[in-house]
Amino acid sequence: MHAPCAASTVPASDPQETWPVGLNADLHCHSVVSDGTLTPDELARRALGNGVQLWSLTDHDEVGGQAQAAQAARSIGLPFLTGVEVSVTFADATVHIVGLGFDDTDTQLLQGLYATRGGRDGRAREMAQGLAQAGIPGTFEGALKYAGNPELISRSHFARYLVEIGICSDIPEVFRRYLTEGKPGYVPHRWATLRNCVRWIRDAGGVAVIAHPGRYGFNPTLEYALFSEFIAHGGQGVEVVTGSHFAHEYPKYADMAREFGLAASRGSDFHSPHESRVDLGALPPVSYTHLRAHETRG
């Protein structure tokens, strides 16, 4: 069950409009359903143990873990929002949009996510071909071992395999040497459009949030274009405090949230105890949110 939508009740235009101050919300993390290493149940318990007061599981392009996450959260008294992180192509780059507090049985949303996932297998096979040409064979099969959901095989799964076989010492090194643009294992992909992604989330009763905007490397003009188009399509929030940003970036995106009238969101982008830079619930707080009305209830 989903509480009534309140997607526009608390804009981020005034940092004094707070609810509630200091809430430990972690609204961005991943499970084995996509490219994380913990189950939804394990994540729920880790979140509670770390003092999280409002939690969302946001697997890539997939809501298959939502029922387990909601049940686990309910069983331990942890407030929960449905979540997903949708892959979008914007200006020939991949951008991620987090959806929060939506109906995870919505047909249009499910069909859109299915279509978005559809190209991952072919992309992964092309990545494996590129790595084989660079002298590293067998990476598709190796990456598949790490993919809890074969439909969602990703660069992270390739990275874990390359660390396993000793090609690199850690995952960041794999990305730097093999999996970013211009490297042997990089394959671009056309994802959902920004318009469609926001529409799926909004029509399912949810809140659309730009994930970790500082990670895309956009120049100021392109970043402004992203925010402007996102707003034009009905986008409602932006991650201001995220484990994918550095602390000096938080004020910039707080200012941009106020400038564009977007709600501020917070999330660790946690994937694994051994890989993630920030643990669940370990970020500085944001001072405003408008997502409580989307909490799922038993």
Task: Report residues per predicted region.
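Residue-level signal for threonine
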Residues: 31, 154, 296
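Alpha-helix N-cap/helix-start and coil->helix boundary motif
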Residues: 62-63, 106, 297
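Conserved small/polar residues in nucleotide/adenosyl-binding loops
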Residues: 289-298
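Extracellular/periplasmic loop regions
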Residues: 277-283
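Extended substrate/RNA-proximal surfaces in nucleic-acid metabolism proteins
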Residues: 2-5, 14, 72-228
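C-terminal helical cap(s) of enzyme catalytic domains, especially alpha/beta-barrels
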Residues: 284-288
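An N-terminally biased module of ancient metal coordination in phosphate/nucleic-acid-related enzymes
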Residues: 2-93, 179-180, 192, 196-200, ...
